[in-house]
Swiss-Prot record:
<keyword id="KW-0964">Secreted</keyword>
<feature type="compositionally biased region" description="Low complexity">
    <location>
        <begin position="91"/>
        <end position="105"/>
    </location>
</feature>
<feature type="region of interest" description="Disordered">
    <location>
        <begin position="87"/>
        <end position="132"/>
    </location>
</feature>
<feature type="region of interest" description="Disordered">
    <location>
        <begin position="23"/>
        <end position="62"/>
    </location>
</feature>
<protein>
    <recommendedName>
        <fullName>Proline-rich protein sgp2</fullName>
    </recommendedName>
</protein>
<feature type="compositionally biased region" description="Polar residues">
    <location>
        <begin position="51"/>
        <end position="62"/>
    </location>
</feature>
<feature type="signal peptide">
    <location>
        <begin position="1"/>
        <end position="20"/>
    </location>
</feature>
<feature type="compositionally biased region" description="Basic and acidic residues">
    <location>
        <begin position="36"/>
        <end position="47"/>
    </location>
</feature>
<dbReference type="GO" id="GO:0005576">
    <property type="term" value="C:extracellular region"/>
</dbReference>
<keyword id="KW-0732">Signal</keyword>
């Protein structure tokens, strides 16, 4: 379980690193490119933005794109959606009784000691507390 968590954290960090590359970087990217220039919030003129919200808008759009990519990735990992269609969900387990049924047996120590199926304990001498 610990290794799965480490794997997913590493994968999310790799996706975040790929999606945060500058525009001129031609390295590997998780986002598909079709040759068109993508307009970003930082490309808008100062008439459309007052300058202070420019960087915030760019980071918000990047963050939204990042979470969309994670959601698409996690949706692609769901085997039930692949098998049963887009409206499928994880099947629910049947309702089980909350308390397990135990045999009607007294749980008192006296009853356990009187039970003949339990082997008797050997007599172990008690340690003396006196010093020699």
């Amino acid at each position: 379980m610990k290794y799965c968590f480490v794997f997913f954290v590493t994968l999310i960090c790799l996706i975040a690193n790929c999606s945060a590359r500058p525009e001129g970087d031609k390295g590997l990217s998780a986002a598909p490119t079709d040759g068109k220039q993508i307009e970003r919030a930082s490309d808008k003129t100062s008439e459309e933005n007052d300058g202070n919200t420019n960087a915030q808008g760019d980071s918000n759009s990047r963050l939204q794109d990042f979470f969309k990519q994670i959601k698409q990735f996690l949706d692609s990992l769901n085997p039930f959606k692949k098998l049963l269609g887009s409206g499928a969900s994880v099947p629910q387990l049947p309702d089980l009784p909350t308390t397990p049924s135990l045999p009607d047996m007294p749980l008192k120590p006296e009853a356990i000691l009187q039970n003949p199926s339990v082997p008797s304990l050997p007599n172990i001498p008690k340690p003396s507390l006196g010093l020699p």
